[in-house]
């Protein structure tokens, strides 16, 4: 992927927010108490990741862990989100002054997706077959397929949502790194031998 090669191989763009978020998703299945802490680290690395809060809750709901662990994990994420909200609301951050809801910005930002992803032809061409493949894999009973579909959709709509809610952020190419990672994970889910 052109975007991954450009923004992940140079030191100017830090990508710890993606690393912390993906490790948090992984740890939901392995060691759930640590996952919400990594989500907090991802938020403090780049506040852009807050858009993925609801898809993360959906991922927890669809994960293959016990009901009790799901409840505790969701509670820990809600507590982490409340703690982050309190820290941002009491601190002098730039995030207080930039909230400005403008619904026309959503459609303008949605229009720029083609321009932003113009060099990632493989990602664009794989989205439709991947969506259809994940749908059929989901019908076979693999729960992760639904979660990956929601995460891919969120990755596509995160930029327009941020543009609609703020007057500060725009659709920038490095914000599509999670999309590239989730497309790769989705391809792995389709070709996995697990039934």
Task: Annotate the PLM regions.
Residues 1-3, 15-22:
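Membrane-embedded helix bundles of polyisoprenyl
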Residues 6-14:
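Short acidic/glycine- and proline-prone juxtamembrane loop motifs at membrane-interface regions
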Residues 14-17, 51, 170-195:
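Hydrophobic/aromatic-rich transmembrane helices and adjacent perimembrane loops
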Residues 21-34:
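Membrane-interface transmembrane helices that cradle and orient dolichyl/undecaprenyl
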Residues 50-79:
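Perimembrane helix-loop-helix junctions
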Residues 97-119:
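Juxtamembrane membrane-water interface segments that cap and precede transmembrane helices
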Residues 122-146, 160:
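Hydrophobic, aromatic-rich transmembrane alpha-helices
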Residues 143-165:
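Transmembrane alpha-helix segments characteristic
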């Amino acid at each position: 992927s052109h975007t991954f090669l450009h923004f992940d191989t140079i030191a100017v763009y830090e990508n710890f927010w993606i690393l912390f978020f993906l490790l948090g998703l992984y740890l939901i299945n392995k060691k759930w108490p640590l996952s919400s802490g990594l989500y907090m680290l991802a938020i403090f690395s780049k506040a852009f990741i807050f858009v993925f809060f609801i898809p993360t809750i959906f991922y927890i709901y669809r994960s293959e862990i016990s009901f009790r662990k799901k409840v505790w994990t969701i509670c820990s994420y809600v507590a982490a989100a409340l703690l982050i909200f309190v820290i941002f609301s009491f601190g002098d951050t730039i995030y207080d002054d930039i909230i400005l809801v403008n619904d026309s910005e959503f459609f303008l930002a949605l229009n720029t997706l083609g321009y932003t992803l113009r060099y990632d032809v493989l990602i664009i061409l794989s989205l439709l077959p991947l969506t259809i493949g994940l749908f059929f894999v989901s019908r076979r009973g693999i729960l992760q397929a639904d979660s990956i579909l929601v995460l891919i959709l969120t990755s596509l709509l995160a930029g327009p949502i941020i543009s609609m809610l703020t007057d500060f952020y725009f659709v920038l190419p490095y914000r599509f790194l999670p999309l590239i990672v989730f497309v790769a994970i989705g391809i792995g889910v389709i070709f996995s031998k697990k039934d």
